[in-house]
A protein has these predicted regions:
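N-terminal active-site segment of His-dependent metallophosphoesterases
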Residues: 20-98
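A generic hydrophobic-helix recognition signal that picks specific residues
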Residues: 5, 35, 73, 118-119
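Extended active-site neighborhood of metal-dependent phosphoesterases/phosphodiesterases
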Residues: 87-156
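Short, structurally constrained coil/turn elements
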Residues: 14, 31, 68, 114-116
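Alpha-helical transmembrane segments and their juxtamembrane interfaces
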Residues: 12-14, 52, 90, 153
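Bacterial Sec-dependent N-terminal signal peptides
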Residues: 1-22
């Protein structure tokens, strides 16, 4: 009797373990003529702190994962990719704990997950210029997002 209880309990646990591995979060579009455009707004607050960066990475990973199921045609970003464009030392804690170079490197890498998978359009914001907030027109944007990378190359779709 004791062995049967242990066997039944083992089978129940095995079943629950297998059930836990099923991806039940399957997004899809009901209308076959529909498509999606993903909007990533103001990433600066995810980028300026190292502990917030995984949130933005998750956003680009989710987007890359759902390109086919949601028929994503483009990704739009509303700018302010970084909090400070040209800050050599990490600013005061309120403004982030990373240098500008670290912020640019991260946001470029995060968007790299979408390279050659879906076109993305990035609008720069005031934080992406000058030393801190657009006091001049100097930006590091072309250094991290060269025109070759951003060109809207047609990605062929099966007919």
């Amino acid at each position: 009797m004791k062995n049967r209880i242990i066997l039944c309990l083992g089978c129940l646990l095995a079943f629950l373990q297998l059930r836990a591995q099923v991806n039940t979060n399957q997004q899809h579009l009901c209308n076959p003529n529909s498509f999606s455009i993903v909007l990533l707004g103001d990433p600066q607050n995810y980028v300026k702190y190292d502990y917030n960066q995984p949130v933005f990475e998750l956003m680009t990973a989710w987007t890359a994962h759902h390109i086919d199921s949601l028929r994503v045609k483009a990704v739009l970003c509303t700018g302010d990719l970084v909090d400070q464009n040209e800050c050599i030392l990490p600013p005061f804690p309120r403004f982030g704990n990373l240098t500008s170079r670290e912020q640019w490197t991260f946001v470029s890498r995060a968007f790299g997950r979408l390279d050659n998978k879906v076109p993305y359009l990035i609008s720069t914001g005031n934080h992406d210029y000058g030393y801190t907030r657009s006091e001049n027109s100097m930006t590091r944007f072309p250094e991290y997002f060269p025109i070759e990378r951003l060109s809207l190359i047609h990605i062929s779709e099966p007919t």
